[in-house]
Amino acid sequence: MTGASRGIGRGIARRLGKAGYDLTISAREGTRLQQAAEELSDITGGSVHPVAADMTAEKDVSRLVRAHDERHGRLDVLVLGAGVGFSAPLAQTSKRRYDLQFDVNVRAAFVLVQEALPLLRKTAAGRPEHGAKVIALASITGLFAEPDLAVYGATKAALISLCQSVNAEASDDGVSATAICPGYVDTDMTAWVRDRIEPRRMIRVDDIVEMALAVTKLSPCAVVPDITVTRPGRQLGRA
């Protein structure tokens, strides 16, 4: 899984480890990733293999899949957790930040799925009663426009569409994909909005973690393309 050193990704890694999964975790910052791996290993008692990778470098993304395949030879769950976002009005968004968000949030996810699909299909064929899953951390901004998040929302819409394509092409083979699309979750990535939304009013990391775990327990006969999670209140379509 990518984006495993912090926030929702780290929470999902911890929960899957406790559920008995052997983990290959990835993040860009090696020191933070190693700390996460040591913590996860202590908590879960299972195998945790850290692979530092820059999601903007295709060779790193490909190397991550190869490293997992060489170590385990199977892939039950691929979690697309790496992501980056910037808040800015559409007219003031730089091309550099546009490119970075699409490189990390969309291109890297596409390459990961493309590289991992043969292994996912192989795993699903070996255990047809369970199949294999792709879980993508998307956003409600991929479904409903949010001011100042035009590019971020566009990348998440692409991620949602990627999951739908996986289902259209691979669900008959036992491989299904689910995009989890929450509003603001109480993590360090949402610190910039806490002057408007109190953390106590945000979605909890554990809420998303439990949804991800539930998806892993579904049979291949149940395909869930996306899950939308909103905060309480009257404007349920807003992040």
Predicted regions: what is each one?
Residues 5-7:
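Conserved glycine-rich cofactor-binding loop
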Residues 91, 144-150, 201:
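Active-site loop immediately N-terminal to the catalytic Tyr-X3-Lys motif
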Residues 19-36:
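Conserved glycine-rich Rossmann-like NAD(P)H-binding loop of the short-chain dehydrogenase/reductase
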Residues 113, 155:
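Active-site helix of classical SDR
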Residues 139:
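Residue(s) in the substrate-gating loop at a strand-loop-helix junction
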Residues 89-90, 94-99:
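Substrate-binding pocket helix/loop in short-chain dehydrogenase/reductase
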Residues 172, 179-180, 187, 195-237:
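C-terminal helical subdomain
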